[in-house]
Amino acid sequence: HMLIMGPPGSGKTMIARRLPTILPPLSPKESLEVTSIYSISGRLGKDAGLITERPFLSPHHTISPQALCGGGKVPRPGLLSLGHRGVLFLDELPEFKRQTLDLLRQPMEDKEIRIARSSGFFTYPADVMVVGAMNPCPCGYYPDRNKCRCTPFEIRRYLSNISGPVLDRIDICVEASRVELSQLKMKKGGESSQSMRRRVMAARRGQEERYAGTPIRFTADLE
């Protein structure tokens, strides 16, 4: 799981949207899992085949708990399960209701979500990469005091909407800096998504070899 913090225009959303392009392709087993979830949720077309691309979902900050986690009279998967094996991007993270964000705690830890109903318990897979993006303060320009007019109290209140237990489950925190127009105009060769994906896949193979013969596949699975 990852949190990207930076001022407006620093590329937070672009970074998040590029993640599926550098992640390894879905394996046949993963593809079947994702397709099954979309099938039982009624989101798979009649003649649709297997889903072969990793899901990327970006809900609005007003999303309801049921839409996020799943539920209903006849329980259906929510976005946490529909994003299984993919990315769930929460833009403007502190704008989400704190109660909604706290619902992420169990699935971020257990990679599945359990829904209790009078008829019993329902468990859906939710092995999704949760990626949050946020400004450092309500106006977005802290610590630049030439632009930021937020008081210390306003900044603390803004940041406190994300609880400690949710932050504890974030593996990587990235600080994105604002890029000046003059820098954008400079033509520099960057690394392509294909090149990054090859490096990610090489690292993944290394972890699979390291944990061969154990129930663990990747370092992220360690308790």
Q: Where do the model's predicted regions map?
A:
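Walker B catalytic acidic pair
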Residues: 85, 91-93, 103
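Short coil/turn segments at secondary-structure boundaries
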Residues: 7-8, 46-51, 212-221
